[in-house]
């Protein structure tokens, strides 16, 4: 879980475009965040297994 101060800081607009970085919308994790879903790999996996992300299915080949 991210610190509340870091989550609040990330919500403010960056002064320069290179300062902006992605954080997970659910838990605030800064690493391994998917841009398409705005979720980290851990939260993405949890929600995908529960079936809460439309169009995402477990791969089988």
Swiss-Prot record:
Pfam families from the UniProt entry: Ribosomal_S14
Residues annotated for Zn(2+) binding in this entry: 24, 27, 40, 43
Details of cofactor binding: Binds 1 zinc ion per subunit.
Keyword tags: Metal-binding, Ribonucleoprotein, Ribosomal protein, RNA-binding, rRNA-binding, Zinc
MF GO annotations: rRNA binding; structural constituent of ribosome; zinc ion binding
Keyword Signal listed: no
Cellular component terms (Gene Ontology): small ribosomal subunit
Gene Ontology biological-process entries: translation
Known partners and oligomeric status: Part of the 30S ribosomal subunit. Contacts proteins S3 and S10.
Family: Belongs to the universal ribosomal protein uS14 family. Zinc-binding uS14 subfamily.
Protein name per its UniProtKB record: Small ribosomal subunit protein uS14
Organism: Streptococcus pyogenes serotype M49 (strain NZ131)
Organismal lineage: Bacteria, Bacillati, Bacillota, Bacilli, Lactobacillales
